[in-house]
Amino acid sequence: MTGLVGENFRRDGGVIPATITKNLNKSSGRQRAREKMADKEFFLSLLSSAATKRDAKAYLSRFPSVKKPKPPIPRQNQGAVETQSGKENEKPGVNLGSFYGATRSVLETPVFRQGPAPETETAHAIGLDEALHVALVKLANAQSLDDETIQGVALTLAQLTRLGMASCVVVDPGPMQDETTWRKAAAEQADRLSAAIDACDGGKARRLDSVLVKNKDRDLPKIISRQVLLRPLRNNHIVVVTPVAYSEETCKASSVPSSDAMLALTRELAGLERKHDPDEDPRVTAEIFAALQKEVAVDRLIVLDSVGGIPAFKGPQQSHVFVNMEQEFKDIEAELHEAMASIERFVDPSAESDITEAATKSNPISKFVATEVTPLSTGQQKPLIEANGGLMTSTLKGHIENLRLLQQTLTLLPPSSSAIITTPRDVANSARPHQDVLSVSQVGTRRQKNPLIHNLLTDKPVYSSSLPSERRGQTAPSIAPSTFLKRGMPLTILPDPRITPWSPNSPDGHHLTLDDPRIDLPRLVHLIEDSFNRKLDVQDYLSRVNGRLAGLIIAGEYEGGAILTWETPPDIPEQDRHKPENISRLVPYLDKFAVLKRSQGAGGVADIVFNAMVRTCLPGGVCWRSRMDNPVNKWYFERSRGTWKLNGSNWAMFWTTPRVPEEDPLKFRDYEAVCRSIQPSWADKKAVVD
């Protein structure tokens, strides 16, 4: 018989002191409070990441939370079974359906889409997508990070796991004097991160020390066992790997570069390390390879490095927000090497004749020289430049290493995979509980976006790469913003601005026509008609633009593009447009900006084309017009420097030219006159609606 006995109570034949039950109740209450607080912080992180409803649908289609059917469980054992094994085996996830219906500003984030947003196709995803979604993370210079930063990084990794993204982290302790010290530091930092993960609510770490092996016949290490990696990842553990490899011949341990460890993990999880039998049926080989790729999806490559995102030394931008690797990798790599060489030149003693003059001509250090060096005497300048020159050179080497690593890894992965470089401090600051971020005297504002959570939900950078810097608002107080990278797509630009800059008196530009054999005119016409959902009068359009083309930009296989022209203001006779006094008044005009419907709102195609237009082709500015009811206008508005409604018409005019109309009213009048005068070339001849 069960009943109270004095201050004790009897349960299942035993007597438990009442004091113990009180302590158990208090402990469970504290646990529930901790879980409630963790849930609150988790959802605050999601909300502050500001994903749109469309992004939420896309996330849910990639990371469906599907429960597998289970055999019926006897009623008497059902509760016990669920208690013991439910949490361990369930797929992590979160119901975001109604969560994203709350914020108007979130729902109205502009996306380049010229038609109604299609419903997200989730039929394939529901129940069919059983791939393990993995993020490979490189934590650089872990020894230099304080405990608070490590804890913030650990919390974010735990939140990624909860959102369905398993993480495998390579811990790089940083530069060390010798091999033994380096391996010891690597183990210590791996333990430090593992302990921080275990301390998070729901966080579980699994440290792997013997996962890498090295063969004398190849430089790159490989993974000793695929299942050693996959088992803990499937059980919702965050795998922590030390970049130490063991020799297959001698079993001797040696350090390997963390970038090599990341490459080895990428190759293994991408299914590229399977030994190929030359006698095997090719169809069997293809089936096995496809099965390996379906088993694991390496969705993200994450580099957490104190040097931050990739800086930009050319153009108005200070950093690369988005990198289209197919188009930009070689140029950015050369840009970083050029910056490093410029530092080394003026640090060299042979350049000391006029150190300040040489330095101020070099973009990467001009600010430092202007503020710190120039005010000093000549004798004081050189030691300061030498000391900081070494630091800047080391930082640039870090940027080059990160860029090369992501280029090599993204090449091995599907085009849908992406990468992000950000600082551990930015991740940690945005992961901290909200009340810790504000002091008593501060005013509460919107919580800082967590770059990793935002990137997972949206597969985009924190802000669009084609936004002018003044429209990006106040971002994190970091000197090195995040960089988002994708394999992307190649760009075809005619004429090539690196060889012949686009100019109204450029001979190449005058002779370029849309009949050029380098241009696939039928595909270009299809791109325009698909994007605008209108039939083009091709011959009328060709007769209008041929002879005045500034250039053409094509993204990928005609997935997006822009046609730009040099237009003549109406008060200049057409036959006089090329006279020297009139050339300066020719208007750079965006005649067509088109993206295939299937590529609108995703993949960054519109941003890739727009960036090429305003940064590479026409950095001095360009104007265009758009119907007043065009849903793309919000997207245009954010990327332009000005907009103007053309009274008496259904047109709005946009431009990216600086200081217009304030300092150049004539140019503004020419822009307006051109935008009013151009006649459309649609086959339906419905110019009235325009």
Swiss-Prot record:
GO cellular component, as recorded: mitochondrial matrix
Region feature Disordered, mapped onto this chain? 62-93
* GO biological processes: L-arginine biosynthetic process; ornithine biosynthetic process
* Pathway annotation from the record: Amino-acid biosynthesis; L-arginine biosynthesis; N(2)-acetyl-L-ornithine from L-glutamate: step 1/4
Instruction: Give start-end positions of Polar residues composition bias.
Output: 75-84
InterPro entries, per this entry?
AceGlu_kinase-like_sf, GlcNAc_Synth_fun, Vertebrate-like_GNAT_dom
Would the keyword Amino-acid biosynthesis be found if you checked this record's keyword annotation?
Answer: yes
Broad EC category: transferase
Subcellular location per the Swiss-Prot or TrEMBL entry:
Mitochondrion
Which UniProt keyword terms apply here?
Acyltransferase, Amino-acid biosynthesis, Mitochondrion, Transferase, Transit peptide
Looking up Gene3D superfamilies in the UniProt record yields: 3.40.630.30, Acetylglutamate kinase-like (3.40.1160.10)
- One Pfam family recorded for the sequence: NAT
Which reaction is this enzyme known to catalyze?
L-glutamate + acetyl-CoA = N-acetyl-L-glutamate + CoA + H(+)
User: Per the UniProt record, which EC number(s) apply here?
Assistant: 2.3.1.1
N-acetyltransferase domain ranges (all copies): 508-679
GO MF terms held by the record: L-glutamate N-acetyltransferase activity
Function noted in UniProt: N-acetylglutamate synthase involved in arginine biosynthesis.
Q: Report the sequence similarity comment from the record.
A: Belongs to the acetyltransferase family.
Task: Supply the name of the protein.
Answer: Amino-acid acetyltransferase, mitochondrial
Organism, per UniProt? Talaromyces stipitatus (strain ATCC 10500 / CBS 375.48 / QM 6759 / NRRL 1006) (Penicillium stipitatum)
